[in-house]
């Protein structure tokens, strides 16, 4: 069988693409995922269903690729990537915070106006059901999208959360009611996509809407070795994928091949397929299909620093309570990048809680 669309990776992007493309009943869609699939919320493993992406239960999980990188010459750092339907949205910290408008506008200035903040706002809204603003979503919130977003009301805040807010306000920072509004800065409730404590991944939000469709085939536990190309013309054309399922290798044909395997695996698959720096490919015995020096280069990620205090004995640090409820966004002194700093108050420690 030749599929109309083959999607490599059922993660944050792939699950959405599969759902949207399969809306056309005349198109066949194959969604490939290297990790397992859990069709029902009740069947999700605990570390996928709950958690904050920081405990050993997720960093050592079989649902995490457990990639490492060298932050310095002397130390390795973890690079968590999801290996399950939902991808990294199934193992993340559920912080549903939009990017800075300036960043999107900078992308637009590079040549594509469609990436400006104003152009993207309708798509931000389309993704979400923001329960805080569901009755009056206005211009900057969604009321009927697949991903559920909420904020903890003030009367549910923990003592440490109240203390954090007071300290920030006393330091002169403003209060921010809505951190997802354009131009927002200061301290206030943090938008989260974990209603009732459940990590609301794209596997739940999007594949939950589409997995019943007869024109959508979801194949978990299938690893893609490479994309296949027809090189007889002037420009290489992707025609299929070579995959491993069980211990067998298969070739699957498709009219369109969509690579959405994440920030690490997507360039890896491209290079294994012959797309990348030709000198680097030749070192590994891979024939070059297309020389592109940037593939697998220039990855940037945000650093994080933990500062820990021991609280007074009378302070409630019940591990079953929510950990992160509010946040501070601000601009570092001397920086020309708006809101380039963010601070969370992690209000509890202990075993992974099932928390709302």
Regions picked out by a protein language model, each given a short descriptive name:
Residues 1-356:
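N-terminal redox-cofactor-binding region of secreted/periplasmic oxidoreductases
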């Amino acid at each position: 069988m030749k599929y109309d669309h083959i999607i490599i990776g059922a993660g944050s992007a792939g699950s959405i693409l599969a759902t949207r493309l399969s809306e056309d009943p005349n198109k066949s869609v194959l969604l490939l995922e290297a990790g397992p699939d859990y069709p029902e919320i009740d069947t999700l493993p605990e570390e996928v269903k709950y958690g904050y992406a920081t405990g050993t239960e997720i960093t050592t999980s079989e649902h995490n690729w457990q990639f490492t990188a060298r932050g310095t010459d002397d130390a390795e750092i973890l690079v968590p990537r999801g290996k399950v339907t939902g991808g990294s949205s199934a193992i993340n910290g559920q912080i549903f915070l939009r990017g800075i408008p300036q960043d999107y506008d900078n992308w637009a200035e590079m040549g594509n106006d469609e990436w400006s903040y104003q152009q993207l706002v309708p798509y931000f809204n389309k993704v979400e059901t923001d329960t805080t603003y569901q009755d009056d979503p206005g211009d900057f919130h969604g009321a009927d999208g697949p991903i559920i977003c909420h904020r903890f009301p003030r009367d549910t805040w923990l003592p440490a959360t109240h203390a954090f807010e007071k300290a920030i306000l006393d330091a002169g920072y403003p209060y921010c009611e809505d951190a997802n509004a354009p131009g927002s800065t200061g301290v206030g409730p943090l938008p989260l996509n974990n209603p009732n404590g459940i990590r609301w991944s794209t596997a739940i939000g999007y594949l939950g809407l589409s997995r019943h469709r007869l024109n959508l085939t979801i194949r978990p536990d299938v690893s893609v070795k490479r994309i296949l190309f027809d090189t007889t013309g002037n420009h290489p054309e992707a025609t299929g994928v070579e995959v491993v399922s069980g211990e067998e290798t298969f070739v699957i044909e498709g009219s369109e091949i969509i690579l959405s395997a994440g920030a690490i695996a997507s360039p890896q698959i491209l290079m294994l397929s012959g797309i990348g720096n030709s000198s680097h490919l030749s070192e590994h015995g891979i024939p070059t299909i297309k020389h592109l020096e940037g593939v697998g280069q220039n990855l940037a990620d945000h650093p994080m620093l933990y500062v820990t205090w021991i609280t007074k004995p009378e302070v409630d640090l019940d591990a079953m309570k929510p950990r992160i409820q509010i946040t501070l966004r601000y601009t570092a002194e001397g920086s020309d990048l708006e809101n380039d700093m963010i601070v969370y108050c992690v209000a509890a420690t202990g075993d992974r809680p099932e928390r709302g």
